[in-house]
Curated annotation (Swiss-Prot):
SUPFAM superfamilies: Restriction endonuclease-like. Belongs to the UPF0102 family. This is UPF0102 protein PsycPRwf_0497. GO terms for molecular function: nucleic acid binding. InterPro entries: Restrct_endonuc-II-like, tRNA_endonuc-like_dom_sf, UPF0102_YraN-like. It comes from the Bacteria. Pfam families: UPF0102 (PF02021). It comes from Psychrobacter sp. (strain PRwf-1).
Length: 142
């Protein structure tokens, strides 16, 4: 094993991990409980964060996608979740539920946590704007 496994991670992956950590921290501050991070089903896809939101009457399993955008010319971070990406996330979530039958009775929800860096007049990046979109898209019947 390499002495420094971070060397095997691209700068983009390292940066993405930082935003995933920001999102995980934020969602946990909102009362959600993190149960999985970067959950993968080979040849299908990956889910950035899997969390549980405990309600009074029921629990919700939250599959969260974390996005970061630098330029608004292409839309904000939330706009980057295409229909194709939604289908991939839904398919991966189904595999997650097959691997974790203990969550079979939970309601499921797909959220997006988006970070957008705004570029100021100086050309320098300004503080990130974050947005949490609960129920960002719906899955067909499970």
């Amino acid at each position: 094993m390499p002495a420094n496994p971070e060397l095997l991670i691209s700068p983009k992956q390292r940066q993405g991990g930082g935003y995933e950590q920001l999102a995980a921290d934020f969602l946990q501050q909102q009362g959600l409980r993190l149960i999985a991070r970067n959950w993968q089903q080979p040849k299908v896809g990956e889910i950035d964060l899997v969390l549980i939101e405990h309600g009074r009457s029921w629990n919700v399993l939250v599959f969260a996608e974390v996005r970061k955008r630098k330029l608004l010319g292409y839309g904000d971070a939330l706009a980057s979740i295409t229909r194709s990406k939604q289908k991939k996330l839904i398919k991966t979530a189904r595999y997650f539920l097959r691997h974790h039958p203990e969550y079979a009775d939970f309601e499921c929800r797909f959220d997006v946590v988006g970070f957008t860096e705004r570029t100021g007049r100086s050309g320098q990046g300004e503080p990130l704007q974050s947005e949490w979109l609960q129920g960002a898209f719906l899955a067909p019947a499970w």
